[in-house]
Amino acid sequence: MHNFNNPNELPKEMLYFTYDEFQKFLSVEKDIKFRCAWQLLYYCGLRIGELKGITWKDIDFENRTVSINKQITQQSCRSRWSFSPPKTAKSNRVLPLTKVLLNDLKLLKESDSKILFGFNDTYFVIGDIAPQISSTITAKKNRNCELAGVKQIRIHDFRHSCASLLIYKGANINTVSKFLGHTKIEETLNTYTHLYKNALTDITALIDDMNNEQKSNF
């Protein structure tokens, strides 16, 4: 039996962007700060609080990594927010950054350093002296989905999209679990078993195609 806060609430369907859908979504984003936000969510599988909690000192440009070591909670407006530890101990993690994302982050930092008064490494990557509020991020996401002509997904579905990308690229369950910061591998399996089944089916179809091609050569 599921234990929901609202007894009338139904579990929300898990949706995710394919890589091509995400590229369409990203192509309509002209704001460098939000380009970085979407890529951090999609390629790093971050929770929304983790995204908002990233400061510039968490970005290691030399080693191409981002350190996830805190999250933002209790935020009702730009001036009211607080830090808290990540959801679990395993949620403290260091994740690799793609070359494109790293370059966008460099451009963003250069821009912020010029236009934000008192800029330093304690400033928020997705924000300024204060983190961006979730409602603004969600509104921007909704608009981009419409402009790009892709399905509407929740902010948390970017995390599922990341898991889907990792699985279809052949990442094992242990790697996916560590990447997402899950406490136990069982959590990853329970959440994404259907994706692994789909990936295995695709692999089987690929082998069948290879076998058919080999037979046609005889």
Residue ranges and their predicted role:
Residues 7-8, 16, 72, 180-205:
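Catalytic-site neighborhood detector that most strongly recognizes the C-terminal catalytic loop/helix
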Residues 19-20, 98-151:
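Active-site/catalytic core of tyrosine-dependent DNA strand-transfer enzymes
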Residues 58-65, 171-191:
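Short, polar N-cap/turn motifs at the start of nucleic acid-interacting alpha helices
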Residues 1-54, 62, 91-92, 159:
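Basic, Lys/Arg- and aromatic-enriched nucleic-acid-binding interface segment
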Residues 63, 74-76, 81-92, 99-101, ...:
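C-terminal secondary-structure termini that scaffold catalytic or DNA-interacting sites
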Residues 155-156, 192:
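Catalytic tyrosine of NAD(P)H-dependent dehydrogenase/reductases that use a Tyr as the general acid/base
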Residues 39, 43, 49-50, 136, ...:
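C-terminal catalytic core of tyrosine-transesterase DNA break-rejoin enzymes
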